[in-house]
Amino acid sequence: MKIINEQLLDETQAKALQSPRLRMNYNFHERLDDPINRLLNAMEPGTYLRPHRHLNPAKDEIFLLLRGKVAVFLFDEEGNITEKTILNPKEGAYGAEI
């Protein structure tokens, strides 16, 4: 069993702060080709996660926020924003399925 606790969050956040991209993954899956990727992604202010999608094979994503807040945008095929929201667990917005 792998427990998500304050120590894991703090350690992953410390690594994110040292990363040039200001983010760091903690992978729960063993291999990148596992059918489901399970990870904790510590993202610090100033980082940018480019719009992307997983097509081969098609995969949905779920974002669950444990700390902080983040803006999430959905785009159409032409790159226009179709949906947007702010996730912030302190305000009751904990996650989004994309």
Residue ranges and their predicted role:
Residues L40-K59:
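Conserved short histidine dyad/triad with adjacent acidic residue
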Residues I62, D76-I98:
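Short acidic-glycine-tyrosine-enriched beta hairpin
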Residues A58-E78:
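Glycine- and acidic-residue-biased ligand/ion/polar-headgroup-sensing regions
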Residues R38, Y48, A93-E97:
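Intrinsic-disorder/low-complexity, polar/charged segments enriched in Ser/Thr/Lys/Arg/Asp/Glu/Gln
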Residues M1-N37, E83-P89:
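A short, N-terminal "cap"/entry segment at the start of jelly-roll beta-barrel domains
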